[in-house]
């Protein structure tokens, strides 16, 4: 078992009238993020019953890859664009991988 991967769950509450705009801006960021070195996955998920509840699942090879992501232009653009679309500040949880083994991602 390896604990090298960093998995980040970001919980976002989006204003009801801004969901489509938020998802469009987030897809631009997600597409660019998936091309970054050290990024294993970047998923955008929406609650089935609450369309304003969005969860980002970000998987990085290590802390350095996650830190590098925060310095990219597309991340800065996303942050600026979506800040007024959020009903509350986003919440993130940093997790370590237990199973499956990192090599299986």
Predicted features along the sequence, with ranges:
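Short alpha-helical
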Residues: 17, 28, 49-51, 73, ...
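An amphipathic, aromatic/His-enriched active-site/gating alpha helix that lines ligand/cofactor pockets
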Residues: 28-40, 59-93
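Glycine-rich beta-strand-turn "strand-cap" elements at beta-sheet edges
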Residues: 1-6, 44-52, 80-105
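N-terminal first-folded block
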Residues: 3-44
């Amino acid at each position: 078992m390896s604990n090298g991967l960093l998995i980040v769950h970001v919980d976002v509450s989006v204003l009801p009238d801004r969901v489509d705009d938020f998802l469009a801006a987030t897809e631009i960021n997600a597409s660019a993020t998936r091309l970054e070195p050290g990024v294993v996955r970047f998923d955008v998920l929406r609650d089935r019953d609450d369309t304003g509840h969005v969860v980002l699942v970000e998987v990085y090879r290590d802390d350095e890859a996650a830190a590098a992501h925060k310095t990219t232009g597309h991340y800065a653009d996303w942050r600026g664009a979506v800040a007024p679309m959020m009903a509350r500040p986003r919440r993130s949880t940093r997790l370590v991988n237990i199973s499956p083994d990192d090599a299986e991602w």
